Amino acid sequence: MNFRYPIFLDLSGKKCLVIGEGHEIAGKVQGLVDAEARVSYVNPRAEPAIQALAAAGQVSWERRNFAELDLDGCFLAIVDCADNAEIFRLAEERQVLVNAADDPKHCRFSFGSVHRQGDLTVAISTNGVAPALAVESKVACRYSSAKKWPPQPPPLT
């Protein structure tokens, strides 16, 4: 695998499409909502967490299968379905950043193991070579940062 360029994206107001179902997809949807993206979720079924986000107006849920027009105006797409290859091709034509879960050849970006604590965000990646090591490193970071974050102002003298 080639070198992946680490980047933190400002997704506020950007249309992001999510296709698929399951616990991991629900986590991705929540992460996009937390990043203030405009989330469009396309799938006949949804996890309870996604249903709640849709009911609260934080996610637009289309209760159907993917259609090519769903990619129009998208900045980013996350997919986990039988059509990963086709959706990747269509996304590439539109210059949409795409991630197909557990399908590296159909990804333009990947998710690292992420630790968030207030304004501190640490993302760790092994380019898919050792995911367990990335998780272990995230856990170590969590324990280390718990003592040091947030930074304390110097004492007043």
Question: Where are the language model's segments positioned?
Answer:
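A short, basic/flexible loop-to-alpha-helix module at the beginning of a structural domain
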Residues: 1-11, 111-112
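Glycine-rich adenosine-cofactor-binding loop
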Residues: 7-29, 155-157
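NAD(P)-binding Rossmann-fold cofactor-contacting core
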Residues: 27, 35-53
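Short beta-strand and adjoining strand-loop segment in the mid-core
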Residues: 36-40, 74-82, 120-129
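Short, conserved active-site loop motifs that form the nucleotide-linked donor/cofactor pocket
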Residues: 58-60
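Conserved SAM/SAH-binding loop
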Residues: 63-68
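ADP-ribose/adenylate-binding Rossmann-like module
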Residues: 76-80, 85-111
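An accessory alpha-helical subdomain
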Residues: 128-157
